[in-house]
A protein has these predicted regions:
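Binding-site signature for planar aromatic cofactors or substrates
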Residues: 2-16, 22-233
């Protein structure tokens, strides 16, 4: 996965002129070389989209590690950044964790549709996903995920409901937990607030914004199979 993502990034900054702008008259820049062959192959574009997501789940330095997720509320669209925890390509599932008391989960309870956005500036590639959410609270998946969660991260679920008003700047944590990890007994109280959000991907919109080899493609899931088509960028 790392090699795939790194190679795509290389195509974004390839063969620049001495002035710092792309030299459109440079034959080597215009040819379909090893860095740009994938831009002419839908199956490789699809593989690249999944590589970006998988890399995001496994590497905290990846720009796809913190995608934006948009939901719908009574006041209109709401968007926030989440931490991508798991990608299952075979099942077309993305997973991240959330507080059941927060607006994101509340909104998904009312309307499970969600949009996901991620952008890799080095690779000059954007992903937009259309998804439907399933919420896992208190079940086997939630429990196994909670048990594998870093104790420091569990502190997030030991605070008042997200968005609660405060008279002063606050983390929401009790003073003893401000500077240390909670014990297993202490963190256990947060499990009731813990939720795993599983997003079933129904469509992937992939956009590569290279100055010369600009490309866009969409992949839609139909009867368990992905169908891809080129789009005008």
């Amino acid at each position: 996965v790392n090699a795939q993502v790194h190679a795509i990034g290389a195509s974004g900054g390839r063969a620049r002129s001495g002035s710092g702008s792309e030299s459109v008259s440079d034959p080597d820049f215009l040819e379909s070389g090893s860095d740009t062959d994938f831009l002419f192959d839908l199956s490789r574009v699809e593989a690249h989209a999944w590589a970006m997501l998988e890399h995001g789940a496994s590497d905290r330095r990846s720009p796809c590690h913190a995608p934006s997720v948009a939901t719908l509320s009574a006041d209109g669209p709401q968007v926030r950044t989440v931490t991508l925890r798991h990608v299952d390509r075979a099942a077309a599932i993305l997973r991240f964790n959330a507080d059941v008391r927060g607006g994101l989960v509340t909104q998904l309870m009312d309307d499970p549709r969600a949009a996901v956005h991620a952008y890799d500036p080095a690779g000059k590639t954007q992903l937009r996903l259309r998804t439907v959410a399933t919420l896992h609270r208190g079940d086997a998946l939630a429990l196994s995920t909670w048990q594998a969660t870093n104790p420091s991260a569990k502190r997030c679920y030991l605070v008042p409901p997200p968005g609660s008003p405060s008279d002063e700047p606050t983390t929401g944590l009790l003073a003893p937990l401000e500077r240390r990890r909670p014990s297993e007994a202490e963190s256990g109280a947060g499990f009731v607030h813990f939720c795993v959000v599983a997003l079933k991907i129904e469509s992937i919109d992939w956009l590569h914004v290279h100055a010369i080899h600009k490309r866009r493609a969409r992949f839609d899931l139909h009867d368990g199979r992905w169908q891809g088509t080129w789009l005008t960028p």
